[in-house]
Amino acid sequence: LKDDYYKVSGGTLEDRGICSYARFAQQTTAPVCSGFLVAPDLLVTAGHCVKGVSNCKNFRWVFDYMVDGSSNVIEQVAVDNVYSCVEVIQRSLSRVSNQDYALIRLDRPVVGRTPVTVRTSGKIADDAQLVIIGHPSGLPTKIADGANVRKNNKRSHFVTNLDSFAGNSGSAVFDANSGL
């Protein structure tokens, strides 16, 4: 491909045994995890996605990995939308505390993107409506809404009926009303 694009390689859900008529079965699956930008060069993902800086350096974080509606196939991504990990600033993966996150520094600031605002105190409302944005099963960006908090009695996490899969690990989950 051209010098300003990377070729996307990966199979499809159909290649993994999903029926060919299933929704998204023909779309390219490449991502292993999801993440979200919290500062120009800082990304949050799941702690089990990044085991350390040497492991993290093997990952690429891609923005605009999505289909435009006219095709199910993503053959290339712009080089400018592909970032590398240079530092794992903080990581936690603990069954005791139920924490599973990593804060990583990217190789350069992400341009043309506004980092998300993260709730830093309190907890989500017991009846909050939720939205998740990520890469379920390695698919291009998907947005799933229509979900809500089901159980909210733990300090570290809540239970929801969000439609998420492997690959959504590290996805941003938003309160549909406040955006936080």
Language-model regions: role of each:
Residues 1-30, 37-40, 44-157, 175:
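Serine endopeptidase catalytic core focused on the charge-relay Asp
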Residues 36-37, 164-180:
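Catalytic nucleophile loop of clan PA
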Residues 159-162:
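RNase H-like polynucleotidyl transferase catalytic core
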